[in-house]
Amino acid sequence: MNISYKISNSIKNLEQYINLYNSCFSEDKFNLDYLNWLYNKNPCGHYIGIDCFDNDVLIGQVGGMPIEFFWKEKKLKIIISINVCVDNNYRGQKLFSKIADKFEMLVKTNNFDGIIAIGNKSATPAWIKSINLTNLGELEAFLGLGEINEDNFDSSQYDFYSCWSEKRLSWRLNNPNNKIF
């Protein structure tokens, strides 16, 4: 094995990401249009992450998407982790912890305020152990429909939230895998 780590390149490496994701995840939802939309057209910024290679073969990745959140009405730059995986043939070698550690340093270097990792039952302990994330509990969310805007949303009732601008909402509705119209 010749393991190396590189900063993710979401313009150049989409084909490699598709191959890795489709081998690690049960759904075959990954394609060029979808990943280009998700990683390169997000109005909050491009995908940021660490890729792990064995020679020239992508075997793992930890990364995420920039999203603006508010904590007690202060705007924060946060990374939400997505599509985190290690190839089945390389699991059990502590690669996730090594990649996650490098990812945490990359996030700090790029002046983000934090990482949100929404993990399943097997991923959550790995996140906590690898970079000492704090488990805040299960995700609670609400969705509002209709005329929700700054005039009728009382942000003082919520400590932590994200507001979806027209630009972000339009981007989200243009997901090529989930056409709305």
Regions found by a protein language model. Give the residues of each.
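Conserved hydrophobic beta-strand within the GNAT/NAT acetyltransferase core sheet
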Residues: S81, G114-I118
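Conserved acetyl-CoA-binding loop-helix of GNAT-fold acetyltransferases
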Residues: V86, R91-L106
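A short, polar/charged loop-to-alpha-helix boundary motif
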Residues: E68-K75
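Conserved N-terminal entry element of GNAT/NAT acetyltransferase domains
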Residues: M1-K12, E147-N152
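Exposed loop/turn and edge beta-strand positions of beta-sandwich/beta-sheet ligand-binding modules
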Residues: H46, K75, I80
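Amide-forming acyltransferase catalytic core, primarily the GNAT-like/NAT-type
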Residues: Q16-N22, S26-Y47, C52-F53, K108-F112, ...
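Conserved beta-strand in the GNAT
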Residues: G49-D51, V57-I67, I80, C85
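Glycine-rich, histidine-containing beta strand-loop boundary motifs that form or position
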Residues: V62, I118-K121
